[in-house]
C-alpha cells in the first residue's frame, strides 16, 4: 500500500517542521487502517486536538490583520479557512494523500482524494506538531499551510464560497449555470455524499463530503480550479 512504503522525509520538508516518527505515523493513520491492523490507535484524537489549534490560530490571525471587519465577516472567513474543502486543498498542495495509511477498502474507493479524510489528516498533523514541538510551532505550521490561500485572493474567495465562484467563472466563459448531481452511499448513520458538477460541457468535476452541501462545495472548487487553470483553452468572444 502506498502510504506504508512512502519515505516521509519529503512530507516533513514541505511541512517545514520535524515530527517524532511515531507521532507522524499516528497522525497519518485512518481508522480504516487501524481496524484492519488489530485495532491499533488511529488519528482521531490528534484530529480533535489539531482542530482546536487550527481554529485558534486562524481566529487570531484574522482578528489582528482585519481591524475593519465585524464579527460576522470574521466568522465567515474563519469558517471558510477551516472548512473541509479548504483543508483538503491545503492537503493536496503538499501531496498529503500519498502518505495516508488507509484500509484496503478505503484505499480502493479513492480515500486518498476524499476531502473529509484529507482535511481530518491535516488537523491530526497539526495536533502531532503541538504535542511534539509545542504551541508556537503548531501555530506557525497552521499559518504556513493556509498562507497560499490567503496570498491568492481569487482562490481564497473560491474557498470561502466555491459555488458562487464557480457560477461567476461559468458566466465569464459563457457556460451557463453549473448543474449538480448528488448521490449518497453508506448506512444512514454514516453516509458519504458524492457530487458531480457539469459546467456547460467545458468542465466536469466531482467532490465528496459528509453532507450534500459539503460534497457540492468540494465539486465546485474542483471545477473552479479546472476552469481557472485552463482559461487559455477557452474560446474568447
From Swiss-Prot:
Cofactors named for this entry: Mg(2+)
InterPro entries: dsRBD_dom (IPR014720), RNase_III (IPR011907), RNase_III_dom (IPR000999), RNase_III_sf (IPR036389)
Main location: cytoplasm
Quaternary data: Homodimer.
Binding, Mg(2+): 47, 120, 123
SUPFAM superfamilies, per the entry: dsRNA-binding domain-like, RNase III domain-like
Keyword Metal-binding found: yes
Residues annotated as catalytic: 51, 123
Pfam families: dsrm, Ribonucleas_3_3
Protein name per its UniProtKB record: Ribonuclease 3
Every RNase III domain range: 8-134
Keywords: Cytoplasm, Endonuclease, Hydrolase, Magnesium, Metal-binding, mRNA processing, Nuclease, RNA-binding, rRNA processing, rRNA-binding, tRNA processing
Amino acid at each position: 500500500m502506498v502510504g506504508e512504503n512512502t519515505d516521509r522525509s519529503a512530507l516533513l520538508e514541505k511541512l517545514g517542521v520535524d515530527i517524532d516518527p511515531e507521532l507522524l505515523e499516528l497522525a497519518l493513520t485512518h481508522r480504516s487502517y487501524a481496524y484492519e491492523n488489530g485495532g491499533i490507535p488511529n488519528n482521531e484524537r490528534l484530529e480533535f486536538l489539531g482542530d482546536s489549534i487550527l481554529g485558534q490560530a486562524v481566529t487570531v490571525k484574522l482578528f489582528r490583520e482585519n481591524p475593519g471587519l465585524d464579527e460576522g465577516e470574521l466568522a465567515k472567513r474563519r469558517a471558510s479557512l477551516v472548512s473541509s474543502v479548504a483543508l483538503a486543498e491545503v492537503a493536496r498542495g503538499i501531496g498529503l494523500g500519498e502518505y495516508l495509511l488507509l484500509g484496503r477498502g478505503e484505499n480502493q474507493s479513492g480515500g486518498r482524494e476524499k476531502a473529509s479524510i484529507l482535511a481530518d489528516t491535516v488537523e491530526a498533523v497539526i495536533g502531532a506538531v503541538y504535542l511534539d514541538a509545542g504551541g508556537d510551532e503548531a501555530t506557525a505550521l497552521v499559518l504556513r499551510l493556509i498562507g497560499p490561500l490567503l496570498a491568492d485572493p481569487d482562490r481564497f474567495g473560491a474557498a470561502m464560497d466555491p459555488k458562487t465562484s464557480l457560477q461567476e467563472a461559468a458566466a465569464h466563459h459563457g457556460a451557463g449555470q453549473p448543474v449538480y448531481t448528488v448521490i449518497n452511499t453508506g448506512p444512514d448513520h454514516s453516509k458519504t455524499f458524492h457530487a458531480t458538477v457539469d459546467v456547460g460541457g467545458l468542465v466536469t468535476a466531482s467532490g465528496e463530503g459528509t453532507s450534500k452541501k459539503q460534497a457540492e462545495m468540494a465539486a465546485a472548487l474542483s471545477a473552479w480550479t479546472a476552469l481557472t487553470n485552463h482559461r487559455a483553452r477557452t474560446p474568447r468572444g
